[in-house]
């Protein structure tokens, strides 16, 4: 595969994943730690309606000096509920994600982007053979990127989960795949930080590869996928260029392809999570 072509494709998608951010974003602090960035309107709304939040000198913060993780979680739940009632948070999931690393609190998944809180996700490149990937098409009812192609497995790391636990859960839900039946290889990670209609998407995505034996039957279990298909790497690269994959899954796929091709010097984008300082913002 043409190395120059791959590099240019990664650079083009990287520009979409990490564009310049709006200068008016307000840093959001929990327990004195910068955990997110919110639009000024969101910061004002919460500070005016929920006791325990302040907006002062350009910093949006939880007034939480004496609070433990449960109390902070309760305050964030109150704020998220107020935002939901006002129509400023939609797509409620009743799923809790961690705030900060190590965790300082938990928050409803749907509210993360309103606060610009960094989330973590795991994605799996499923190889049928060295030149063929198994991919999944997102269901039409999905809130984000309906109908686009995706990695076979991909999803958020829930509060209290390890990366491996999240990957195993998502593999079972999305493909009926028992992770202990395949050999999983850890790839690199990357971070997306971009404005979205819901606020700010700040997400660290961890990449994994696995070879899927022909004997394994793959079937979606949670209704969030409407097709599973096999595509050659050449077909996948063409689909990425045509915008047929989600941005996240395109970058996940290219991480694997470039790594396997020995292209490991893509600066300031793909990184080794275990040795990196990029664990939050």
Q: Model-found features: residue ranges?
A:
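N-terminal leader/linker segments that precede catalytic domains of diphosphate-processing enzymes
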Residues: 1-148, 156-169, 177-216, 233, ...
């Amino acid at each position: 595969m043409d190395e120059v072509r791959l590099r240019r494709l990664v650079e083009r998608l990287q520009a979409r994943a990490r564009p310049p951010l709006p200068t008016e974003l307000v840093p959001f602090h929990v327990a004195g730690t910068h955990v997110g960035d919110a639009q000024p309107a969101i910061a004002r709304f919460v500070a005016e309606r929920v006791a325990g939040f302040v907006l002062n000198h350009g910093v949006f913060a939880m007034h939480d000096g004496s609070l433990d993780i449960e109390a902070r979680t309760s305050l964030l739940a109150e704020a998220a509920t107020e935002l939901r009632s006002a129509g400023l948070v939609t797509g409620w999931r009743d799923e809790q994600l961690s705030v900060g690393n190590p965790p300082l609190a938990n928050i409803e998944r749907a509210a993360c982007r309103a606060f610009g809180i960094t989330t973590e996700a795991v994605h799996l490149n499923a190889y049928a053979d060295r030149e063929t990937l198994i991919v999944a098409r997102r269901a039409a009812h999905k809130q984000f990127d309906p109908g686009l192609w995706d990695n076979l497995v991909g999803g958020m790391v829930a509060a209290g989960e390890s990366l491996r636990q999240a990957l195993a859960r998502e593999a079972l839900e999305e493909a009926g795949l028992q992770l202990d039946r395949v050999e999983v290889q850890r790839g690199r990670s990357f971070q997306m930080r971009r404005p979205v209609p819901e606020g700010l998407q700040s997400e660290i995505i961890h990449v994994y590869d696995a070879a899927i034996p022909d004997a394994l039957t793959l079937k979606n279990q949670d209704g969030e996928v409407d097709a599973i298909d096999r595509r050659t790497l050449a077909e996948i690269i063409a689909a990425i260029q045509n915008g047929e994959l989600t941005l996240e899954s395109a970058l996940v796929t290219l991480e694997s392809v470039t790594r396997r091709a020995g292209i490991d010097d893509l600066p300031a984008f793909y990184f080794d999570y275990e040795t990196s300082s990029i664990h939050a913002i």
